[in-house]
Amino acid sequence: MSIHVKNNIHWVGQRDWEVRDFHGTEYKTHKGTSYNSYLIREGKNVLIDTVDHKFSREFVQNLAAEIDLATIDYVVINHAEEDHAGALTELMARIPGTPIYCTHNAIDSITGHHHHPEWNFHPVKTGDSLDIGNGKQLVFIETPMLHWPDSMMTYMTEDAVLFSNDAFGQHYCDEHLFNDEVDQTELMEQCQRYYANILTPFSPLVTAKIKEVLGFNLPVSMVATSHGIVWREDPTQIILKYLEWADHYQEDRITLFYDSMSNNTRMMADAIAQGIHEVDPGVAVKIYNVARHDKNEILTQVFRSKGILVGSSTMNNVMMPKVAGMLEEITGLRFRNKRASAFGSYGWTGGAVDRIQTRLMDAGFDISISLKAKWRPDGSALAECREHGRQLARQWALHPLDAPRPLATTQATPAPEMPAAVTAAPKATAAAAEWDDDQAMLCTVCQWVYDPAQGEPDQLVAPGTPWAQVPDSFLCPGCGIGKEVFEPCAVEACV
């Protein structure tokens, strides 16, 4: 079954109502998902992306009912991951010589998944275009690490449709295809969940890439994503949201999560939350047991929060395993502009709290004092927990607590405005800031470190070259992204 998108563009993807786990079991898809593939019929027939490999045969059968496969002139693969390009083997068996347009990195990924190096690959880079007839072109825009090195977007001129790949999407299945046809609250919840759990580590690149795309001054009438709905009504709303979420996002919200063997740490969490509420009744407070709640919901709440409290009983002098796993996830997501504190109960040693505090510091949180309670907290210990909550509420307040609360309490900063005309993403050069000659620089995407003492001989950057003198054409050896995603870092702190 196909769905008309616009003019000669049709959706030919696959809905997946049943899927509940994505990326292995790392992402819970309670609302299902869709694998969006698009068929363009102009002077040339173009297929943009396929579907997940488990639907390969069904996809090709449905596509053959829509169009004579032999008349497909080009296949465009925006992303090589199996939920996008999974049906390629089944499809290319039917049309083996058809050109496949993708990035250089995608050729490696596609070949690694499908083991067909003989396919007719045509690598593209940002600014390359493909004439599809009737005065229309496809323009390609590389988006490395959003969220794979091979990722790109495709823009269709005249129709002004941006096929955005994973960006601006959501794991959300609905019989309706367009954003104006579905529940808006549910939709935005899934968009934020998707960003928080998948794209947060790449926020600096999100901002740079959106500004680069806007700098082309191309009109956008629709954003056709790879998962979930197509943005037809006011498509710039999701672009604005991404700019907001990428800008050290926080709300006036505090999240507590914990694990407990005997409910002692749970009692502490409840008391701390009570203390926060006593001092700042307007702040949103949520409590989660990591052993019982949806991990991705907790991570989304962490993304939204100005501060978090992480609690654990001590077991074998370390934290509970599920708390440790959650902190590993949080470290990888690289949240910014957030405060944190550890708490927990113990019997004879209290190693869990100290280890949590260290992990939170390593993850980039602004650390506040921690709290321990021995054995089951009594009335005095619970009073101490409530006082701890009161102190944190005062320290973490986004507004004077003795003044009337602002009307808009959920946002720490106003949403950014869409630039009227934006130039290409700014380069992190000496013009923007002056660095010491020995200043190391950290790639915020892959964590590779540029050490001036070592330089980067593979790119003809000699040892002893300060960052300000590194050419603007420099690309991170770890992820292939430019200087705009680097930030200062002490060498000893980065290695």
From Swiss-Prot:
Fe cation 2 binds at residues 83, 166, 227. Fe cation 3 binds at residues 443, 446, 476, 479. FMN binds at residues 260-264, 342-369. Keywords: Cytoplasm, Electron transport, Flavoprotein, FMN, Iron, Metal-binding, Oxidoreductase, Transport. Signal peptide: none annotated. The gene is norV. This is Anaerobic nitric oxide reductase flavorubredoxin. One of its GO terms (molecular function) is FMN binding. Residues 30-210 are annotated as: Zinc metallo-hydrolase. Binds 3 Fe cations per monomer. It comes from Aeromonas hydrophila subsp. hydrophila (strain ATCC 7966 / DSM 30187 / BCRC 13018 / CCUG 14551 / JCM 1027 / KCTC 2358 / NCIMB 9240 / NCTC 8049). Gene3D superfamilies: 2.20.28.10, 3.40.50.360, Ribonuclease Z/Hydroxyacylglutathione hydrolase-like. Pathway: Nitrogen metabolism; nitric oxide reduction. CDD domains: flavodiiron_proteins_MBL-fold (cd07709), rubredoxin (cd00730). The keyword Membrane does not apply. Its main location: cytoplasm. In the N-terminal section; belongs to the zinc metallo-hydrolase group 3 family. Residues 438-489 form the Rubredoxin-like domain. Its cofactor is Fe cation; FMN. It is found in: Cytoplasm. Residues 254-393 form the Flavodoxin-like domain. Fe cation 1 binds at residues 79, 81, 147, 166. Homotetramer. One of its GO terms (cellular component) is cytoplasm.
